[in-house]
């Protein structure tokens, strides 16, 4: 009998039960072996896993458990001791690994629980971030709507368009049932329904501004929910409505524009507001959200700014229209003034010509009478007539000069002259009158005063004569002193600053008298044309009141200044003026040529047999001019028209006197035709002299452009015509008196 080293099963075998256990252990073993493989796979795929050793222990535990189940398959039947030993070893290892894993889990489980806590924290954080993102999206959406509404509002500067656009865009953006704007009335005591969303022309009814709901809204800058039944919220019929929509109201500031007065705008002596009311659709559960209220508040502020801009634009356009109307009126006034000035100048020109013609006869005949044998009484009368005529001629020249000064047509005629000689000539002219009144006159010229200067000699002499003449006229006793010096800085004329250079200097002339003096309050009137103060003179003193007015304008034209100083009535006065003069750079020889009318050679004085042609449309003037020439020994032929002059003139005539004040320009063109007539015999062409009553510079320039040889200003005396003939026959071109 063979011996078997086997172990019998512990209980009798049941074939069916054994099969189920066998199959179960097999699948348990397969599961235990597959779980570690899956864990190893996922751990390798995971980039971060903090419990790798625990996983190794857990895997070993599972593998050993699977091994015990697999070995247990051989224990259901008779098996050898080796199988039992293997089974025991596997269970011991499984027990060790299981205990180690259990001990390790004591430390791992709290960490695993904290992971869950972190997960919950992260979920809460994520939910909070989602809420914040929703708020940001809401704010962004609100901002987008605000920008869109602002763009629509700012796209125009018309007040009515702004308000209507605001209501339309708010109604579209917020899906409103109604939106309205209440504007304060002019008195500010009521609110008037001015604009609504659904009605183009709302019924204009008002509510008192002292309503509690209005005070509540005006008391805060936030949008306020109000009752749908409040007076300002009754915008649409409520019949048939189950539930009215929620209503909010917000104030719209009307910005104070201190520099503008806007029509149809409330008086803004105190802070004023308009009221904007917004209603959600009725019969709906919709409510106002915070971001919608914020949108309404921002839009209200934007509307306030846009309204202020529109108001400024309206006032600017109104001011522009007013300015355009004023400009049109000013332009019309300017044209009328220019027309009046032209009419005045034309009138003065005509009157000048018409008055100079009889004066020409008076002065000419008086000068002829002076050449005859007269008794002392007759000579005195003739001299009186001549002086009165010359005074009248001077007055006419003053009026014409003033007219040209005022319209800016008068210009200075600059030239080099002897300044010292000019002062001496002025004294020579004034001394006869001063001697009669027993008034001594002294002339003081500063040592550094230049002798030869560049300026308008005639106008400077006229200024000095006017001022010195006034000193003589209004002084009954005492003395008169004339001082000339180079101007230095003077603080008394605060608005006039002297800036001399190497090419010019400022001449100061002081005329001091011991006459009647001037009341200080009358000094500002002195330089007013046609003005004579009672303290200064009476009408018996003579004069037109133009002398100082013209002198002031001449001084201004010479870039100077003039003023008068007086301590009061009976204390005399001092007239002071500064004028700008150029410093002459000419040589001594050329300077000597600037000395006025000092003949260097004997002048012609015998004109016997000189054939002269006189053309003048005025019979009296023609006769007087002929008489002067005949008295000088000339053989005179007279004509009354241009055609007759052109037909009569011949090479026998040495001089032709022609009146250029005749109507039209033919009187100038006749000079050109005379030049053409003598083209082949230029040396036989007669000298052409213009007789003119116009003292302006344009007459002289026109005469030069038409080829005339000289100009003689009416009225003409015997000495004038003698000097002209002498100068022409030397020969040299003369433009006398211009």
Curated annotation (Swiss-Prot):
Location of the Response regulatory domain: 611-729
Phenotype for residue 353 to E: Reduced affinity toward EIN2
Result of altering residue 99 to S: No effect on dimerization or ethylene binding
Superkingdom of this protein's organism: Eukaryota
Keyword Transport appears in the UniProt entry: no
Cross-link (Glycyl lysine isopeptide (Lys-Gly) (interchain with G-Cter in ubiquitin)): 714
Location of the GAF domain: 158-307
Membrane-protein topology: Multi-pass membrane protein
Posttranslational mods: Autophosphorylated. Phosphorylation at His-353 modulates the interaction with EIN2.
UniProt key word Secreted: no
Location(s), subcellular: Endoplasmic reticulum membrane
Enzyme type, top EC level: transferase
Effect on the protein upon substituting residue 104 to A: No effect on ethylene binding
Entry binding sites for Cu cation: 65, 69
Enzyme Commission numbers on file: 2.7.13.3
One Gene Ontology term of the molecular function aspect: phosphorelay sensor kinase activity
Modified residues (4-aspartylphosphate): 659
Domain Histidine kinase residue range list: 350-585
Transmembrane stretches, start-end: 23-43, 53-73, 92-112
Cofactor(s) named in the record: Cu cation
Tissue: Leaves, roots, stems, seedlings, flowers, anthers, carpels and ovules.
Outcome reported for the amino acid change (mutating residue 69 to A): No copper binding and ethylene insensitivity
Observed effect of gene inactivation: No visible phenotype in ethylene response; due to redundancy with ERS1. Ers1 and etr1 double mutants display a constitutive ethylene-response phenotype.
Function: Ethylene receptor related to bacterial two-component regulators. Acts as a redundant negative regulator of ethylene signaling. In the presence of ethylene, the auto-kinase activity of ETR1 is inhibited and the non-phosphorylated kinase domain binds tightly to the corresponding domain of EIN2.
UniProt note: domains: The GAF domain is sufficient to mediate heteromerization.
Protein name (Swiss-Prot/TrEMBL): Ethylene receptor 1
Gene giving rise to this polypeptide: ETR1
């Amino acid at each position: 009998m063979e011996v078997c080293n086997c172990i019998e099963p512990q209980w009798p075998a049941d074939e069916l039960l054994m099969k189920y256990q066998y199959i179960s252990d097999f699948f348990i073993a397969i599961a235990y072996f597959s779980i570690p493989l899956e864990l190893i796979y996922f751990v390798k795929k995971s980039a971060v896993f903090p419990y790798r050793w625990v996983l190794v222990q857990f895997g070993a535990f599972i593998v050993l458990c699977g091994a015990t189940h697999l070995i247990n398959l051989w224990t259901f039947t008779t098996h050898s001791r080796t199988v039992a030993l293997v089974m025991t070893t596997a269970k011991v290892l499984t027990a060790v690994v299981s205990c180690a894993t259990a001990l390790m889990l004591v430390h791992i489980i709290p960490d695993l629980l904290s992971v869950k806590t972190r997960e919950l924290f992260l979920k809460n954080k994520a939910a909070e971030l989602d809420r914040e993102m929703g708020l940001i999206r809401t704010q962004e959406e609100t901002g987008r709507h605000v920008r869109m509404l602002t763009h629509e509002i700012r796209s125009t500067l018309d007040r009515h368009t702004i308000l209507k656009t605001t209501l339309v865009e708010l109604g579209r953006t917020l899906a409103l049932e109604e939106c309205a704007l209440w504007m304060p009335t002019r008195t500010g005591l009521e609110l008037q329904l001015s604009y609504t969303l659904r009605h183009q022309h709302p019924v204009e009814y008002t509510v008192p501004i002292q309503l509690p709901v209005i005070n509540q809204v005006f008391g805060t800058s936030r949008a306020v929910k109000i009752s749908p039944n409040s007076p300002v919220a009754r915008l649409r019929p409520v019949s048939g409505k189950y539930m009215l929509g929620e209503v909010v109201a917000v104030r719209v500031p009307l910005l104070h524009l201190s520099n503008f007065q806007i029509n149809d705008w409330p008086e803004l002596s105190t802070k004023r507001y308009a009221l904007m009311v917004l209603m959600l659709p009725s019969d709906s559960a919709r409510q106002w959200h915070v971001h919608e209220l914020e949108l309404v508040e921002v839009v209200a502020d934007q509307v306030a700014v846009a309204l202020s801009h529109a108001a400024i634009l309206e006032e600017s356009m109104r001011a522009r229209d007013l300015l355009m109307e004023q400009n049109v009126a000013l332009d019309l006034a300017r044209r009328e003034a220019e027309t009046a000035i032209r009419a005045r100048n034309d009138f003065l020109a005509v009157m000048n010509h018409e008055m100079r013609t009889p004066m020409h006869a008076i002065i000419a005949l008086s000068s002829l009478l002076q050449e005859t044998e007269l008794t002392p009484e007759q000579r005195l009368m003739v001299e009186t007539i001549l002086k009165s005529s010359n005074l009248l001629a001077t007055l006419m020249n003053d009026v014409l000069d003033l007219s040209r000064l005022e319209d800016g047509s008068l210009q200075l005629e600059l030239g080099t002259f002897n300044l010292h000689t000019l002062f001496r000539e002025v004294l020579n002219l004034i001394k006869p009158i001063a001697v009669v009144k027993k008034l001594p006159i002294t002339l003081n010229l500063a040592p550094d005063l230049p002798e030869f200067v560049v300026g308008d000699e005639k106008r400077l002499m006229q200024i000095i004569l006017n001022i010195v003449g006034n000193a003589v006229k209004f002084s009954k006793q005492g003395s008169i002193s004339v001082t000339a010096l180079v101007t230095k800085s003077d603080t008394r004329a605060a608005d006039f600053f002297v800036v001399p250079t190497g090419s010019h200097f400022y001449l100061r002339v002081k005329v001091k008298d011991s006459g009647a003096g001037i009341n200080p309050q009358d000094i500002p009137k002195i330089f007013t044309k046609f003005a004579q103060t009672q303290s200064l003179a009476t009408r018996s003193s003579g004069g037109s009141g133009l002398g100082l007015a013209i002198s002031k304008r001449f001084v201004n034209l010479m870039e100077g200044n003039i003023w008068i100083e007086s301590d009061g009535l009976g204390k005399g006065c001092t007239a002071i003026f500064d004028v700008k003069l150029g410093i002459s750079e000419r040589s001594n020889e050329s300077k000597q040529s600037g000395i006025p009318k000092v003949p260097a050679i004997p002048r012609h004085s015998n004109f016997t047999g000189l054939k002269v042609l006189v053309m003048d449309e005025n019979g009296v003037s023609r006769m007087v001019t002929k008489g002067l020439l005949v008295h000088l020994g000339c053989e005179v032929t007279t004509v009354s028209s241009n055609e007759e002059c052109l037909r009569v003139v011949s090479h026998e005539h040495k001089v032709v006197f022609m009146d250029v004040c005749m109507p039209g320009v033919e009187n100038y063109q006749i000079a050109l035709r005379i030049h053409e007539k003598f083209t082949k015999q230029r040396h036989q062409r007669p000298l052409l002299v213009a007789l003119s009553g116009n003292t302006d510079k344009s007459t002289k320039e026109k005469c030069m452009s038409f080829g005339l040889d000289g100009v003689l200003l009416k009225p003409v005396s015997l000495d004038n015509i003698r000097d002209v003939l002498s100068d022409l026959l030397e020969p040299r071109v003369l433009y006398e008196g211009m």
